[in-house]
């Protein structure tokens, strides 16, 4: 067997499948003809060993703790770039020039308003509707307002939908928050930056204008960068799968938002905060909590540690930890939960039980503390995740649409049910 192929022996046959090279990281082999040649399909629950796509957008190495967008290390982008610049990079493949970035920002600024009729959707939602439910519903509803953008193969329509979504999602998210607390909606302002505008729409009230602290603006911008893409995760794969049916961008992104909502995906940072609050309620006894985790007492779990992909320290967690200190210091807050988090991290990183299981802090461990310090309730945490992940979803959707020979996603199954039986009338059952 050569390095360029994989041989499968089954029954009396021998079948060869070509190896697919990568520029860096995992290689694969193409099993496109497997079923036709052998009658077999592969079973890979959770897709832990299956590459559904070839992509040039994001690279991560879970063993080494590496994350790169279009080849740029996440550490450099978080330190030196801005969220909109990173969004341009992910979607277009290259960092923008000064003129390109100016045009990109101006285009987004001109599309931040929502159609006035969109307010009727919010008025129809129950008072206690979850912000993620409102977010996905309104994004899907944009398809009804922009029926000129339904053709995914029209480049002009794709680009316009991209600008509209990037511009309007902060407004949609802020309105979802306002609905949840019964406050009037605040219109966007064209003289403010992307993050400043979102914070103002979220926290301003008629009686008092919200003026965001520059440290808070910088920290949130950095958090959005760190969440902007993460290869083929659950929500991104959902966006691609829905988009493979040639659904428009609004419908595809709405599906991704719903996938992100799950507690195993975007909802993990809320679970971390609840865990820290539980330790606080127990007198801040970290040692007792660690013991319960190790002894598997009372179903206690260590949240915010470990990752499906990363087997070492999540590179994003290091950056977010520093941002947590900056935000709390700038806001003059002394947060007991941060102290508990630091103690918990110290204990876990020095305990062979956790180290041997590759349980290192992940991106969710500190984000909830930062969001909480900024004034966001826990129900908004996943909304903020979606706001950051939007450029990645859009970039992945574009890449999928433009892929030559792209086919609708249609997984196979291995059927384990009853083979066949005859129908029995209800009277005879």
Residue map of PLM features:
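Non-transmembrane, aqueous-exposed alpha-helical and coiled segments at domain scale
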Residues: 1-429
């Amino acid at each position: 067997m050569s390095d360029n192929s994989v041989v499968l022996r089954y029954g009396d046959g021998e079948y060869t499948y070509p190896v697919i090279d990568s520029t860096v990281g995992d290689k694969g082999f193409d099993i496109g003809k497997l079923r036709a040649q052998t009658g077999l399909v592969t079973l890979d629950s959770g897709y832990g060993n299956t590459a559904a796509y070839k992509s040039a957008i994001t690279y991560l190495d879970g063993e080494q703790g590496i994350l790169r967008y279009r080849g740029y290390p996440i550490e450099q982008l978080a330190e030196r770039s801005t969220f909109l610049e990173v969004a341009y990079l992910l979607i277009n493949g290259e960092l923008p020039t000064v003129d390109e970035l100016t045009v990109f920002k101006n285009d987004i600024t001109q599309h931040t308003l929502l159609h006035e009729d969109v307010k009727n959707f919010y008025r129809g939602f129950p008072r206690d509707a979850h912000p993620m439910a409102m977010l996905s519903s309104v994004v899907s509803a944009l398809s009804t307002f922009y029926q000129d953008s339904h053709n995914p193969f029209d480049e002009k329509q794709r680009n316009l939908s991209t600008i509209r979504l990037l511009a309007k999602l902060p407004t949609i998210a802020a309105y979802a928050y306002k609905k949840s607390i019964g406050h009037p909606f605040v219109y966007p302002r064209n003289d403010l930056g992307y993050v400043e505008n979102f914070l103002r729409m979220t926290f301003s009230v008629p009686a008092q204008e919200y003026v965001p602290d520059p440290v808070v603006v910088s920290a949130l911008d950095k958090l959005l960068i760190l969440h902007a893409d993460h290869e083929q995760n659950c929500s991104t794969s959902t966006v691609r799968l829905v988009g493979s049916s040639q659904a428009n961008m609004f419908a595809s992104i709405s599906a991704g938002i719903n996938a992100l909502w799950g507690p195993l995906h975007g909802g993990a940072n809320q679970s971390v905060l609840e865990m820290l609050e539980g330790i606080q309620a127990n007198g801040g006894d970290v040692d007792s909590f660690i013991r319960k985790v190790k002894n598997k007492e009372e179903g206690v779990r260590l949240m915010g540690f470990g990752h499906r992909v990363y087997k070492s320290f999540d590179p994003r967690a290091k950056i977010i930890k520093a941002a947590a200190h900056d935000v709390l210091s700038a806001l003059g807050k002394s947060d007991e939960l941060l102290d508990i988090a630091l103690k918990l991290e110290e204990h876990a990183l020095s305990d062979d039980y956790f180290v041997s299981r590759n349980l290192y802090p992940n991106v969710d461990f500190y984000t909830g503390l930062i969001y909480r310090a900024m004034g966001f309730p826990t129900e908004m945490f996943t909304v903020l995740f979606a706001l950051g992940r939007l450029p990645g979803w859009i970039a992945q959707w574009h890449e999928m649409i433009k892929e030559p020979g792209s086919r609708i996603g249609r997984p196979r199954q291995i059927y384990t049910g009853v083979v066949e039986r005859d129908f029995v009338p209800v009277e005879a059952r």
